[in-house]
Amino acid sequence: MAKRHSHYQGSRRRHARGSNSKKAGRGNAKGIQGRKIKKKPTPTNSWHNSSIPLGEGDLDDVGADFNPGRAFISPKTIEDYYFGRDAKSRSMKMGGLRPGNRYDSSTDLQAGRAAFRKRPMQFVKAKEVYDPSHNMIQKLRAKNETKNSEEIVEREADVFEEPGKMTSDVEYINNEDSENEDDDSQNSPSTDHSLSSNESKVEDGDLFFVDEEAQQSPDLTKIKRVCIEEIARPREVAIEFDPILTIGKVELSVSEGNESKEISVDVPNKGNKTYHPFAGYISNVLHGMHTSDSDNDELDYEIETENNSEPLYESSASSEVDQGFNYVGQRHNSRADNNLLPSPSPQLTEDIKCLSINGTKTFEGNNDNLSSPASEELEFGFKEEDFVINTNDIVVSNIRMGGVDNSYYLRCYRLLGDYDFHWIDQDLLTDFVVDELGLPEDRLPAYLNFIKNSLIPKIEPAEPTYSDIPISDSSDEGDSYEGDSYEDDEDMASSVVHSDIEEGLDDLIAYTLKHDTERFKTFETKSLETKGKGKKKKLLIDDALALDTETLETLQSKFSKRIETKAKKRKAKEDFIDQENRNSNDMLKKYPYGLHIQNIKDEFESFLSRNNDRLTFPPLDPHGNKTVMKIAKHYNMKSSKIGKANHTSVVVEKIKKTKWSSPNYSLIDQLMRQRPVFMRIDIRRPREEQAAFERTKTIRGKFHVKEGEIVGQNAPEIGNENIGRRMLEKLGWKSGEGLGIQGNKGISEPIFAKIKKNRSGLRHSES
């Protein structure tokens, strides 16, 4: 039979474990000290017998289902069922578990003893609605309706009366209205009663008026008409007007309209000739043009004479002639040459009336082919709408030019969400600038050009210095140079340059061919050959070099110095790394090979004072990890193991008890008096440190023997201090005699043993 757990037993049996009982803890009646406890006899049921019927006979027997044959239940039983027999007077536990309602007195609050938070909340609908503002509004509305109805009836009645009675009636009505207002202000309650009486006096027929005769239209001739002059208010301008508008490097004269709010650009008219915006530029270009060829001058003169009556810059299309553009050619010669005839400069014959600021075309005709400098696209930063972009927010450091679109390497927190540089496409940048920052689309190309120009500066061509062209000071050479053509000058200059370059070229080629073999000679390179190890390491030099002794010593000293320098540098580097790791919080770097028990305590003390929550120790052997966990327990910290095999280490964490409890230093001192040193098991120790911690082994000397050598040949004679020799001398032995009795003295010379390294000694032979 399976064992029954203790929580299935009664409360008394579960706690009764007497020492004198035969069945301890198994329902024994004895207590802890062996005394007997009287058990109360349990009745057949939990209901008490009573002669009082349940609910005075009005209710059924509650226990009839599980206790048939019983028809009476005492009041104590009912109280026990609903509220508990031994419950406190105001126990929330029993009141929540039982379905009863204690101290239910919602009507009488004084008689009820229950707290207000335990009483049920009841909502009762009011019989009357208390709204004083609503009543006042209703009264005022009724008063206004009666007053308006009386005025309408009186006005309609006065239409049919004589004109003489109208004045008296009006005075009477005004007096009556004033009296009514005084009465209303003095006695407001009386007006409420009069309103109901007035409403009852007015009949329904008096409320409506039927006009049987049509109303005659008034005579408009008798109405006087007055003409009122409108006074024009002076227009206040908050911005100071500047008659000169500067756009880039162009200045335009601007005029302000008197009545209209428009600003126009004044274009000067020089007589009947119409001003052209490029007239000055064209005249300067034509003024500076000249040709040295006389044939070209004659050809130009023929063209001018043949087309003198026609415009010089006439277009072949007939539509341009209809538009009214009439060009007149004019040409000025810069040189004082009378042979060249001047021609008139091209000018427009159509008048340009006005140029609007907003770019609208106000002049007549279809002059789309003409463009003014003011209509060209301005650079970024010359318009007010350009300042919606803060160049400090969008920092572009690089650009990748593409066939269709470009990519930008920029930093923008609003676009990217961080302060790092990222590559983004041009579409993403334009959408952000237009949608998010609000830059107009017409200014977008100017902004992109601004970014490109800031990253890729324009390279201006260098001015030619003509330093490679020889210039003579003599007047003869100057005259001859001016008389020759430009092509002859170039040929002469190139010949002079080539002659200077070729000077000494033959000698240079000869020298190069002479030393060509030595220049391209290859040398065999290999590492230095050495012998020995450590401090005994020396340079091995070939005897075929036939170097003298001084040179060999110099090479050996340099080689040894090189080795010492490398060792010092390596040692200094290791010392520097160790010094830096001593102040590190990482214990794997701080203790590269092992740690002392005092180091473990110091680490716990520093960890207790720091704000860190975790501390990881280096991997130790199982006993070392267990020691660290014991110390962590005495410091009121939580410890756990991480890793596997040789990489198992202990991690210490702080808990709530660590802050409010002090460490147990007595137990910590006991652990410190035990094992002192703990080495790491995840790395190998160097030989020097391994020899310091491990037991050194005795090293026996190695003896070398030679072929044919007699064993013990050089051994000294046994002296008189030897106790064995003294005993033999007492027995009658003398030096040089053999050992034995009389007649059998033995040999006087010992048998010699020779070393034979080329013999195998006695061995078993098959023969």
Swiss-Prot record:
Q: Where is the R3H domain?
A: 594-656
Q: Indicate where this protein resides in the cell.
A: Cytoplasm; Nucleus
> For the modification Phosphoserine, which residues carry it?
S105, S217, S255, S334, S343, S345
Biological process (GO) annotations held by this record are:
mRNA processing; RNA splicing
Q: Fetch the InterPro entries from UniProt.
A: G_patch_dom, R3H_dom_sf, R3H_G-patch, Splicing_assoc_domain
Compositional bias per record (Polar residues), positions renumbered to this chain = 42-52
Where would I find the G-patch domain in this sequence?
A: 720-767
Which family is this sequence assigned to?
Belongs to the SQS1 family.
Q: What is this protein called?
A: Protein SQS1
Q: Which organism is it from?
A: Saccharomyces cerevisiae (strain YJM789) (Baker's yeast)
